[in-house]
Amino acid sequence: MSYAEKPDEITKDEWMEKLNNLHIQRADMNRLIMNYLVTEGFKEAAEKFRMESGIEPSVDLETLDERIKIREMILKGQIQEAISLINSLHPELLDTNRYLYFHLQQQHLIELIRQRETEAALEFAQTQLAEQGEESRECLTEMERTLALLAFDNPEESPFGDLLNMMQRQKVWSEVNQAVLDYENRESTPKLAKLLKLLLWAQNELDQKKVKYPKMTDLSKGTIEEPK
């Protein structure tokens, strides 16, 4: 084959055969799983996985308790309680991370709107969020989107209804979790997530070079499609 000739395109079946022939140590896979569970704060799952796999976590699992409490509060919509706990554990964190503090305050505003406490929501926005909105265009835009929910009888069905979705609470928790881990000088992104980002980067590079290859189109299901 000359230098100018292109190699034959690899089919999905050929690609899957190559993947199946790869030998990855189970212990390495188990360490990835344990790393994910610890980083995301899933203590009970990590304890159970340790017993099943024999893999020891990189940190004392008891140190996860505080993050678990914060997660439970945020996912229940108890934002003020979560802020108090964060301040008691890491007094300087929210002072040095103003966007994180704003997002927590914004989430409290969302919870007031969810509970149809209109007057309390307006007062909170004016006394707690207005100043940050004046200092940051990004914060102002987010605050305006949040307050726009008050214009609808059924805010859940409005164009801004995504703010009332439970995934919004999860988003705030993820931001808090990463900030706490960074503050404690601990790994804040699971190794598994880094590997998936590397996969997406590699596929993007191949796409830009117009290379045809079996592409993973659904990370959650591991779906791989034929070259196109």
From Swiss-Prot:
It holds the Pfam family CTLH. It is found in: Cytoplasm; Nucleus. Homodimer; may also form higher oligomers. Identified in the CTLH complex that contains GID4, RANBP9 and/or RANBP10, MKLN1, MAEA, RMND5A (or alternatively its paralog RMND5B), GID8, ARMC8, WDR26 and YPEL5. Within this complex, MAEA, RMND5A (or alternatively its paralog RMND5B), GID8, WDR26, and RANBP9 and/or RANBP10 form the catalytic core, while GID4, MKLN1, ARMC8 and YPEL5 have ancillary roles. Interacts with RANBP9. Part of a complex consisting of RANBP9, MKLN1 and GID8. Interacts with CTNNB1, AXIN1 and GSK3B. This is Glucose-induced degradation protein 8 homolog. Transmembrane segments: none annotated. It comes from the Eukaryota. One of its GO terms (molecular function) is protein homodimerization activity. Residues 25-57 form the LisH domain. Signal peptide: none annotated. The lineage of its organism: Eukaryota, Metazoa, Chordata, Craniata, Vertebrata. It comes from Gallus gallus (Chicken). The keyword Metal-binding does not apply. Belongs to the GID8 family. Keywords: Cytoplasm, Nucleus, Wnt signaling pathway. GO terms for cellular component: cell junction; cytoplasm; cytosol; nucleoplasm; nucleus; ubiquitin ligase complex. Residues 63-120 form the CTLH domain. GO terms for biological process: positive regulation of canonical Wnt signaling pathway; positive regulation of cell population proliferation; proteasome-mediated ubiquitin-dependent protein catabolic process; Wnt signaling pathway. Core component of the CTLH E3 ubiquitin-protein ligase complex that selectively accepts ubiquitin from UBE2H and mediates ubiquitination and subsequent proteasomal degradation of the transcription factor HBP1. Acts as a positive regulator of Wnt signaling pathway by promoting beta-catenin (CTNNB1) nuclear accumulation.
